[in-house]
């Protein structure tokens, strides 16, 4: 599943091709995505795209009339292509531009979304209760400590809770906890301020580095140019259960936590 770095890499890839371009059509071949594509989505036709933003793992394509809210789901991708590019399987939506280019949405599993919002997007039900962006100053040790106070849940589950901080999915939660030396099952409310300070710094550093490297290469993710990301070459724990720890040589443990695969080092990561 594309996580925050992959979505940000996609935003960076498509934005230069979309901003200040006029939309001449929205071709919907299959409206049966995670939520049905609303007919209102076609209100973007005739509009000029003002900016392309990201909120959590949602891409926001802004016009004066409203905002297209796009989610890549489990396997979705967005590509900038010439308008006459042949349609392939799972090419569900084309945003057609006046300059002869298209933004094509491909989603084999159809867990993605293409919605329309005329309200201030912060008021949309999918966005209104989201926590702070991890790469902004709003995500800091004081905010995290307050959000975790009294919580008995495992820290990894809290780190993946979009009400606490957005965009820290399974891959990067595993990696950040390893880098911070914190056991993923540690009780969130009992982690002291010093360790939380390290954790916040590692979340920011790991996400920023993943964006710089182009996102994580998993079987489904390619960027807006169809190229894979490269961060998977640098993963320390995710997907490496049973292999040796890169720091101490101990075998990495693999468990299920919140129905997600969790990998950690029982020596380097403590409760």
UniProtKB/Swiss-Prot annotation:
EC number per UniProt: 3.2.2.23, 4.2.99.18
Catalytic activity: Hydrolysis of DNA containing ring-opened 7-methylguanine residues, releasing 2,6-diamino-4-hydroxy-5-(N-methyl)formamidopyrimidine; 2'-deoxyribonucleotide-(2'-deoxyribose 5'-phosphate)-2'-deoxyribonucleotide-DNA = a 3'-end 2'-deoxyribonucleotide-(2,3-dehydro-2,3-deoxyribose 5'-phosphate)-DNA + a 5'-end 5'-phospho-2'-deoxyribonucleoside-DNA + H(+)
GO biological process: base-excision repair
Alphabetized InterPro entries for the sequence: DNA_glyclase/AP_lyase_DNA-bd, DNA_glyclase_Znf_dom_DNA_BS, Formamido-pyr_DNA_Glyclase, FPG_cat, MutM-like_N-ter, Ribosomal_uS13-like_H2TH, Znf_DNA_glyclase/AP_lyase, Znf_FPG/IleRS
SUPFAM superfamilies the UniProt entry points to: Glucocorticoid receptor-like (DNA-binding domain) (SSF57716), N-terminal domain of MutM-like DNA repair proteins (SSF81624), S13-like H2TH domain (SSF46946)
Disulphide bond pairs: none
A Pfam cross-reference name: Fapy_DNA_glyco
Domain of life: Bacteria
Reported cofactor(s): Zn(2+)
One Gene Ontology MF term: 8-oxo-7,8-dihydroguanine DNA N-glycosylase activity
Entry binding sites for DNA: 90, 109, 151
List of catalytic residues: 2 (schiff-base intermediate with dna), 3 (proton donor), 57 (proton donor), 260 (proton donor)
UniProt keyword list: DNA damage, DNA repair, DNA-binding, Glycosidase, Hydrolase, Lyase, Metal-binding, Multifunctional enzyme, Zinc, Zinc-finger
Purpose: Involved in base excision repair of DNA damaged by oxidation or by mutagenic agents. Acts as a DNA glycosylase that recognizes and removes damaged bases. Has a preference for oxidized purines, such as 7,8-dihydro-8-oxoguanine (8-oxoG). Has AP (apurinic/apyrimidinic) lyase activity and introduces nicks in the DNA strand. Cleaves the DNA backbone by beta-delta elimination to generate a single-strand break at the site of the removed base with both 3'- and 5'-phosphates.
Subunit structure: Monomer.
HAMAP family from the UniProt entry: Fapy_DNA_glycosyl (MF_00103)
Name of this protein: Formamidopyrimidine-DNA glycosylase
Annotated source species: Shewanella sp. (strain ANA-3)
Gene of this entry: mutM
């Amino acid at each position: 599943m594309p996580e925050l770095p992959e979505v940000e890499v996609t935003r960076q890839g498509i934005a230069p091709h979309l901003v200040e371009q006029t939309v001449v059509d929205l071709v919907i071949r299959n409206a049966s995505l995670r939520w049905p594509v609303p007919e209102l989505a076609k209100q973007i036709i005739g509009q000029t795209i003002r900016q392309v933003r990201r909120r959590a793992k949602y891409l926001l394509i802004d016009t004066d009339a409203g905002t297209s809210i796009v989610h890549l789901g489990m396997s979705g991708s967005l590509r900038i292509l010439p308008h006459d590019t042949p349609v392939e399987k799972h090419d569900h939506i084309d945003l057609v531009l006046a300059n002869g280019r298209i933004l094509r949405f491909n989603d084999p599993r159809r867990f993605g979304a293409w919605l329309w919002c005329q309200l201030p997007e912060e008021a949309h039900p999918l966005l209104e209760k989201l926590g702070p962006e991890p790469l902004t100053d709003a995500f800091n040790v004081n905010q995290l400590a307050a959000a975790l106070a009294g919580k008995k849940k495992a820290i990894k589950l809290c780190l993946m809770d979009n009400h606490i901080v957005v965009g820290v999915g399974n891959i990067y939660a595993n990696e950040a906890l390893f880098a911070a030396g914190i056991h993923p099952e540690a009780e969130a409310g009992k982690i002291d301020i010093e360790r939380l300070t390290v954790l916040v710094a590692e979340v920011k550093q790991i996400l920023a580095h993943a964006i710089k490297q182009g996102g994580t290469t998993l079987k489904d993710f390619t960027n807006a140019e169809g190229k894979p990301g490269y961060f998977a070459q640098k993963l320390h724990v995710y997907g490496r259960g049973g292999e040796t720890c890169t720091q101490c040589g101990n075998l990495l443990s693999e468990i299920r936590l919140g129905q997600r695969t969790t990998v950690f080092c029982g020596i380097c990561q403590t409760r």
